[in-house]
């Protein structure tokens, strides 16, 4: 039940803070977020690490070179406050990256 609530909260935060194409996952301990093609998730990760937010870039889950604009974020060990803060930071950095392009 706790993880179900965290999952629902994480999806809500992702939709609120992150400009996304789609959010994948049907529950569990992580969500997969697909961004616009112009956002490189590895570059996004480099910037997020500096603000203490980490995730797995999506391309590691593909063998065909796809997924460069996606990421998987786990939240099992994070509080609701940390989940919201993390998604807010990711969203801020994506907006900065879009302004740079």
Predicted features and spans:
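Short, contiguous acidic/charged loop-to-helix segments that flank catalytic cores in large enzymes
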Residues: 1, 21, 33-36, 62-63, ...
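Conserved glycine-rich beta-strand-loop-beta hairpin in the small C-terminal domain of fold type I
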Residues: 2-11, 21-34
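Alpha-helical structural signal in soluble globular domains
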Residues: 9, 13-17, 47, 93
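Preference for bulky hydrophobic residues occupying beta-strand positions
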Residues: 14, 33, 73-75
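Surface-exposed helix-capping loop/turn segments at secondary-structure junctions
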Residues: 15-23, 98-101
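Conserved C-terminal alpha-helix-loop-beta "cap" of PLP-dependent enzymes
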Residues: 33-71, 85
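PLP-dependent enzyme catalytic core of the Aspartate aminotransferase-like
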Residues: 50-51, 65-101
């Amino acid at each position: 039940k706790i993880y179900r609530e965290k999952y629902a909260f994480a999806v809500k935060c992702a939709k609120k803070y992150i400009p996304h194409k789609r959010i994948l996952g049907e529950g569990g301990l992580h969500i997969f977020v697909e961004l616009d093609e112009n956002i490189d998730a590895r570059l996004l990760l480099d910037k997020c690490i500096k603000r203490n937010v980490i995730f797995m870039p999506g391309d590691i889950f593909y063998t065909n070179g796809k997924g460069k604009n996606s990421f998987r974020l786990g939240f099992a060990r994070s509080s609701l406050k940390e989940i919201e803060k993390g998604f807010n930071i990711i969203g801020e950095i994506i907006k900065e990256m879009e302004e740079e392009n």
